[in-house]
Design a protein with these regions (language model features):
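Structural signature of alpha-solenoid helical repeat scaffolds
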Residues: 11, 61, 65, 69, ...
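Acidic/His metal-coordination segments adjacent to aromatic residues that form catalytic metal sites
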Residues: 2-6, 53-60, 124-136
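Aromatic (Trp/Tyr) and acidic
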Residues: 6, 14-41, 45-48, 71-126, ...
Length: 260
């Protein structure tokens, strides 16, 4: 049970991806002569945690509670792929975990990259049904999910050389800069000559009107979510009213969650 009474909290549930990234980075910092590097213990623990959460759960469930599965993309897979590819911190005479993973290099490399591919394919099945290639759910922080998914596509493409999903990757980037139903950039001040957010959830702009160029706003949400938000109210006319739909809405106005 949460220890606060606020209606919106950051209730992260997953942890295996964090531990995977931690173990992978500890291994990367070790010299190949280090005893623990030689046994491959930290590397092996990273792989074992990768197996606990092969696909980030919001991708599978097509939804999430507020920050339920943060940080929306598994960076540990990318670190492991780099280390296997470079055989980073592995001794010449490997033993234990490192020997197993080096000897089975193609198998483990393909397995880890396939974790990314499986997640991308799930989103693609949804995205392929609309002109914007939109397969990311319209939940809170949908723009953060969009960035995370584009990052996953990029890491998969650059590590494997498979550009099958490059158009999907680019569509998610384009979405953030105006190729969306509202025709507006989701990044404050970028491009300078375009339609960009002017009233983000930020004390800097709300109180002192300071610019926060480069700030990413939360983005559109399902209409059903918007109608049930607590403490949210539009103080100005909805400039995007013509483009709102029963599916999703976007407002250039203060919303909980704010600029990322």
């Amino acid at each position: 049970m949460p220890s606060v009474k606020a209606p919106y909290i950051y209730a992260e549930e997953n942890w295996a991806d964090d531990m995977e990234l931690a173990y992978a980075n500890v291994h990367a910092m070790m010299k190949s002569t280090d005893e623990n590097a030689g046994s491959g213990w930290f590397f092996g623990q990273a792989v074992l945690h990768a197996q606990k959460e092969p696909i980030t759960k919001w991708i599978i469930n097509d939804t999430a509670n507020h920050y339920q599965w943060y940080p929306f993309v598994n960076a540990g897979h990318f670190e492991l792929l780099k280390q296997i590819k470079l055989k980073q911190a592995f001794p010449k005479q490997a033993s234990g975990f490192s020997a197993e993973f080096i000897n089975k290099f193609p198998t483990y490399y393909d397995t880890l990259s396939n974790y990314y591919k499986q997640g991308i394919e799930i989103v693609w099945q949804r995205a392929s049904e609309n002109a914007f290639y939109r397969g990311v759910p319209f939940i809170w922080c949908s723009n953060n999910l969009t960035v995370a998914f584009a990052q996953q596509c990029y890491w998969y493409r650059t590590q494997t050389g498979d550009d099958s999903y490059e158009a999907l990757e680019q569509a998610n980037i384009d979405w953030l800069f105006g190729c969306n139903p509202w025709g507006t950039s989701m990044v404050y001040g970028l491009p300078e000559w375009g339609d960009t957010p002017v009233d983000p959830h930020s004390a800097f702009t709300n109180i002192k009107r300071y610019p926060i160029d480069g700030g990413l706003v939360d983005g559109p949400v399902y209409n059903s979510i918007y109608k049930n938000l607590i403490g949210i109210k539009l103080y100005n006319e909805d400039e995007y009213a013509t483009f709102q739909s029963n599916l999703a809405v976007y407002h250039d106005a203060e919303q909980p969650g704010g600029v990322s």
